[in-house]
């Protein structure tokens, strides 16, 4: 489902209602229609991209004959950690030295962090847009 949402314009009833609601919230928050359209587009892409990645993991889990998501993700993280620790440190010092930080948080924490980062950026850009002269604004 997430894959189908990529590179398409929402035309289904549910997608249209969700888009209308989100777009309305952004406009009511004081964004210009153009700015709100860009923000909504980026938020939607973030959500759909995350859903698509999750669907890829579920497919891999099933293909591996696993039923427990925790077991799958622990094995997935072990595989990444083992690979990064085998990299030549002189070529990849940051990945090698910080592999535990790179793999520390689970999908939910990463999703929440990314969403907050995106929302904070939209809020900051909107606040900055309000202080720019009309020619510098997204119209």
Predicted regions and their residues:
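C-terminal peripheral helix-coil segments that are non-catalytic and often amphipathic
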Residues: 31, 56-139
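Amphipathic alpha-helical packing segments from all-alpha helical-bundle domains
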Residues: 6-30, 34-41, 81-93
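C-terminal module of multi-pass small-molecule transporters
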Residues: 2-3
